């Protein structure tokens, strides 16, 4: 099954009718792209923060991008740059968002735990958590052979520090040793830190 966040039927993430800010879609992008091995569709300018706020033809100004009318959208025109396809006309914010999309989608192809691995949901072990709000954060694990990914996303507008419970069943299911310390690499920032995995 195809995963997606935007299509011609849905209001754009960045539109005034939905989130109003394309950066608010990044946590959902990470979850949708990394949760399973399914393909991820990026829709016509989504990676640049297309707002879909033009008043175009059949549908009018509704936060969507028409597929029924002969139309072009601002972000794609900027990315095309009069046929150079170099993105030089994109704003700095659009370039930054594009870099995030490129990084996440590249990880989906490079990381075997995402493209071929098993999934373990951690949400059931983190309801009413001491330092985890199940309404604002989401977490799961992916594993393939010796590669383990611990994915945590924050849907809140504020940065947070979280503590995540890993149930003992996860260690059995994923065949990972308990009470070990690991060198963890943040795949979006390349920051390295030591973490300990203790069963809950």
PLM-predicted stretches and their roles:
Residues 17, 30, 86-90:
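Residue-level detector of alpha-helix boundaries and kinks
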Residues 24-31, 99-100:
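Long, well-ordered alpha-helical scaffolding segments within enzyme catalytic domains
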Residues 20-26, 132:
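Short, glycine/acidic-rich beta->alpha junctions
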Residues 39-42, 46-200:
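Carbohydrate-interacting/catalytic domains
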Residues 29-41:
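Active-site region of glycoside hydrolase catalytic domains
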Residues 7, 35, 107:
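Conserved catalytic core of Hanks-type protein kinase domains
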Residues 1-20:
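Active-site clefts of carbohydrate-active enzymes
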Residues 3, 31, 103-106:
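Residue-level signal for well-ordered alpha-helical scaffold segments within enzymatic catalytic domains
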